[in-house]
Amino acid sequence: MRRNKPLKSKLNMNNHKTYLAFNVDAVRDSKMENLHTLNLLGDWQKRYPNRFGFVNIDYINFIATHDDLVETTVKSDFFALMEKADNLMLVVTKDTDADNVWLNWQISRAVNRYHLPVIVAFKGESVVTDETLKEYWNHIPQKIKKYIGRDSARMCYIPLTETKVEKALGYFSVNTQTYPHNSTTIY
């Protein structure tokens, strides 16, 4: 894995907007880590609106409480939100379903249609290494594994910590053409 050099970014200012890829079913299940993670990210955004700009966090909460939405409407809304984003973030936990259709669909569209750099954050880790990827391999979405195998998407891997997330979201952007080096960049 290639490591990026430490970034010298402006703390307390992030103008980039981030699309959060998520598993709708997992967000609805209050016993799963995904709901707790979503609440953590929402809390960061409320406390530091100039540092975290998740374009779809309110929509995720809306979807979680409405299981009667029509698939075509949801996909249309996802496209509109992805179009506003500078990057895509995915949080991988021990509960992440690597085969979830909606999660893999979002990743595929964000990469193939909007060319968003992907930031994969591992919950519960303070540092990410090659061993982290091996440990979580069964929980990494199939689309991410496919991109790793083909080296066909620009992705970086970080621990889910406030500082690392802020720096990665503030640095990688489709609009500034700032991407991770390849599909296996550990940041």
Residue ranges of model-derived segments:
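Conserved N-terminal substructure of TIR/SEFIR domains
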Residues: 1-84, 181-187
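C-terminal interaction surface of TIR/SEFIR-family domains
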Residues: 2-28, 43, 128-187
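A short acidic (Asp/Glu
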Residues: 30-32, 100-103, 130-132
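Conserved beta-strand termini and adjacent loop/short-helix elements that scaffold enzyme active sites
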Residues: 55-59, 121, 158-160
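Conserved beta-strand segments of alpha/beta enzyme cores
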Residues: 51-53, 117, 154
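Conserved beta-strand-loop-alpha-helix hinge of the TIR/SEFIR fold
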Residues: 81-107, 116-125
